């Protein structure tokens, strides 16, 4: 019996072998996963985490595929993806407990259905809630740390809620314990004017359509903004706005967005990222940091010059590049 057979035997849920990952990411790039698993519920999730630990199988976590670059060679081991309808959602007054696999786009409307506001900033963010919570996703309207009160973290030994205050939330990051997976997210909102909230979200969507390349596959922002600066302005200033490598390009609409013009590879995308980091560092002395999570087996030459990048693709405590498993949006 192979390790894939053993995991399928132990873990209730969906198991897809050699599953293409490019269609499951926002930028539409990357190779297949050895095994893509969608556990049926919390017990099945803990069973999966226990199985990969016992069998020594690498584990990566994929949410909606935003801010994620999968290696051209794909991802060895298990890629975990929580179902959208993962059990355990609830509402109690101004507090909602939501599945980490829930698409972000539907959450403001759910809050509005209960007369609650405060999630307007999620209206323009792709991906899933778990990934957004794990990386403290946000926009000019707010960020996840403004509303998250607790995360339910699953491990091989079970699951439990951890207060947001214990997770070290900061700009586009939080500190998840090694080997933990976000299963559910608790948010606290406030009663408010739903019509005004919807109008604010419509206005923000129109602004994004006018200033971002939303007609092409893209991560969203590639680099975080340095203190007091904008990554897009720096990339444009070094002459890379519209610069193309293979099927990938620094968007002529917004220079901090890599877009896939068709047939782009992870190698193409990383070449653009390395070039931008090098030129900005040389001219401005600023080391740009990526928002993009790397998942899978990347050749060393593709990672050269990407010190400090976030890596996925290994197992609990031993992800690709030596990092722990992370939730990707």
UniProtKB/Swiss-Prot annotation:
Its main location: cytoplasm. One of its GO terms (biological process) is cell wall organization. This is UDP-N-acetylenolpyruvoylglucosamine reductase. HAMAP family: MurB (MF_00037). One of its GO terms (cellular component) is cytosol. Pfam families: FAD_binding_4, MurB_C. Belongs to the MurB family. The active site is at 172, 221 (proton donor), 291. It comes from the Bacteria. Residues 204-225, 303-329 are annotated as: Disordered. One of its GO terms (molecular function) is FAD binding. Residues 311-320 have a biased composition (Gly residues). It catalyses: UDP-N-acetyl-alpha-D-muramate + NADP(+) = UDP-N-acetyl-3-O-(1-carboxyvinyl)-alpha-D-glucosamine + NADPH + H(+). Pathway: Cell wall biogenesis; peptidoglycan biosynthesis. It is an enzyme of class 1 (oxidoreductase). Its EC number is 1.3.1.98. It is found in: Cytoplasm. Its cofactor is FAD. Cell wall formation. Keywords: Cell cycle, Cell division, Cell shape, Cell wall biogenesis/degradation, Cytoplasm, FAD, Flavoprotein, NADP, Oxidoreductase, Peptidoglycan synthesis. Residues 28-192 form the FAD-binding PCMH-type domain. The keyword Cell cycle applies.
């Amino acid at each position: 019996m192979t390790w894939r057979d053993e995991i399928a035997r132990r873990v209730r849920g969906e198991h897809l072998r050699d599953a293409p990952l490019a269609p499951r990411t926002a930028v539409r790039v990357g190779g297949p996963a050895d095994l893509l698993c969608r556990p049926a519920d919390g017990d099945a999730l803990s069973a999966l985490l226990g199985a990969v630990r016992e069998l020594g199988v690498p584990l990566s976590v994929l949410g909606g595929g935003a801010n994620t670059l999968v290696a051209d060679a794909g991802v060895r081991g298990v890629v975990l993806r929580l179902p959208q309808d993962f059990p355990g959602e609830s509402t109690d007054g101004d507090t909602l407990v939501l599945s980490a696999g829930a698409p972000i786009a539907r959450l403001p409307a759910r809050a509005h259905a209960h007369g609650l506001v405060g999630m307007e900033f999620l209206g323009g963010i792709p991906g899933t809630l778990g990934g957004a919570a794990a990386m403290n996703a946000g926009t000019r309207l707010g960020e996840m740390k403004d509303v998250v009160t607790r995360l339910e973290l699953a491990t091989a030994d079970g699951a439990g809620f951890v207060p947001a205050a214990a997770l070290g939330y900061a700009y586009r990051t939080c500190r998840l314990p090694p080997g933990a997976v976000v299963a559910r997210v608790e948010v606290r909102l406030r009663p408010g004017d739903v019509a005004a909230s919807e109008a604010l979200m419509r206005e923000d969507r129109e602004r994004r359509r006018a200033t971002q390349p939303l007609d092409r596959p893209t991560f969203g922002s590639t680099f975080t903004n340095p203190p007091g600066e904008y990554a897009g302005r720096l990339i444009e200033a070094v002459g890379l706005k519209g610069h193309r490598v293979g099927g990938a390009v620094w968007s002529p609409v917004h220079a901090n967005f890599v877009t896939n013009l068709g047939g782009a590879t992870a190698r193409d995308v990383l070449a653009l990222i390395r070039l931008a980091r090098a030129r900005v560092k040389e001219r401005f002395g600023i080391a740009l940091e990526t928002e993009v999570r790397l998942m899978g087996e990347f050749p060393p030459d593709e990672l050269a010059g990407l010190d400090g990048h976030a890596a996925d693709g290994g197992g609990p405590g031993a992800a690709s590049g030596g990092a722990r498993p992370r939730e990707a949006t």
